[in-house]
Amino acid sequence: KYSVGIIGLGRMGSTIDDEGHPSVILPYSIAAACKASNNLELIAGADLSNEKREQFKNKWDINSVYENYETMIKEENPEIVAICTKADVHSEIGIKVSNLNVPMIYLEKAIACSLKESDLLKSTCLKNKTIFNTGVMRRFDSVYNTVHKLINSGAIGTLESIIQYAHTTLLHGHIHSIDTISFLNNDTKIKGIRGHLSTSPAPWEPL
């Protein structure tokens, strides 16, 4: 089993399974997925909030909880670190975790809030030979894979264009849009992206 430490013990780290979304296939949170897996062992969690640390500790029966994620990594030595904080600190934490020589990182979307941050995170992981993945998971969904197979088989004709419609935020939701289009087009190298976004406030802001 691979040992896992989680940074950020909120919704995606620990509690989203309890929200009762009818369309969600469980397990959904990283902690729940670790507990359900035969290949992963959840060993520790880190969060700035004492309340979230205590909730995580009691919910998942994990005694090793930390306020400082760097301390968690140094003391627990996890093989995988899952970063589930808010997006504005994702790249900063990802870079630090890679530089602490953690072998594998799972970083929730968005991996960064700018291309400059993304490039620095990528170069750091390549330099340290960190195995890296992020939360664009729809390419692993059976529905999307069925469409992918239909396109490749020619059963629905020749691929001419892919149009994605989604009422969502850029960093939270349209990451899925871009990755889905890429996946359905066999991950052909992207030459350019153009989109139209509304500047009106989003009706909700995910945590």
Where in this protein do the model-derived segments appear?
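N-terminal Rossmann-like dinucleotide-binding module
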Residues: K1-W60, S182
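Hydrophobic residues in well-ordered beta-strands that form the structural core
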Residues: I6, Y106-L107, F132-T134
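Beta-loop-alpha module in the N-terminal Rossmann-like domain of NAD(P)-dependent dehydrogenases
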Residues: E51, W60-C125
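Short strand-turn motif at the edge of the Rossmann-like AdoMet-binding core
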Residues: K109-A110, V136-R138, A166-H167
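Rossmann-fold dehydrogenase core element
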Residues: L120-R138, G157-I163
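Rossmann-like NAD(P)H-binding beta-loop-alpha module
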Residues: S142-S161
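Rossmann-like dinucleotide-binding domain that binds NAD(P)(H)
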Residues: T158-L207
